[in-house]
């Protein structure tokens, strides 16, 4: 481990004064050492604390973790997420403590091997064929056969999956068929699925090809609310970004996530923005969703409680 793990008796640290948003959390007793979590990260930039928070929680619980990215490239943290002077425009305050900035820089350091050689989703999971393919039927049969093999041999070893947020998922996770297939298989296997910030819309678009119905229909979720959206400064970075282009700024996000989640949950579900609350984490099994950066530790903590205490509902 390249950074100090949080102790199980860490004192409450309020988000005011820009301290780490750590709750007075204690791990469940007799936590088994055999849990394994699959963590999905964007190759276009993830928000540092949204990895560090859950990861430190999993480490403290003795969990094993595997990392995966769309093509197997090493993920890179977004620069503002390791800058303690960065002021989040919608919140009007710094959102990165000095301690967190150091932790993010440590795990982002190329000399730190922890994020090296992530699983390549492209190499691991099959691609769904085009309908226009002359061998469509045979290719679809092979596609489903391969998914069944992966489900039986690979996915059975995982207890849960987590999709880390940041602006990067907008580019290569939200509309990624292989990410959708992972989510659907975890869902069908009744395994908890956690997502943070702009990783949450992956849940809205993971739909069975037959009924095409949202799997969060009728569910309660949180995510990046409209009040938290940038008017400018939505940036990306990583191995896919051409260095000759300089800083990439798409202005506002590609879409208002809140509207997508409100529509995807339907009249019997609900999106919870919890504007004005410092932390917003919702558990509606099998989904654990975190709104944004300050919710990172709490998202990991609720997932541990889902796995160890049978938590099925929280925050609504």
Stretches with model-predicted labels:
Residues 192-193:
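Glycine- and acidic-residue-rich phosphate-binding/metal-coordinating active-site segment common to enzymes
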Residues 5-6, 251:
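Generic extreme N-terminus detector
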Residues 197:
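Aromatic-residue-lined binding/catalytic grooves and analogous aromatic/hydrophobic interfacial grooves
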Residues 33-189, 202-316:
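Extended, subdomain-level signal for the structured scaffold at the beginning of enzyme domains
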Residues 1, 8-29:
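Short, basic, low-complexity termini and linkers enriched in Ser/Thr/Gly/Pro
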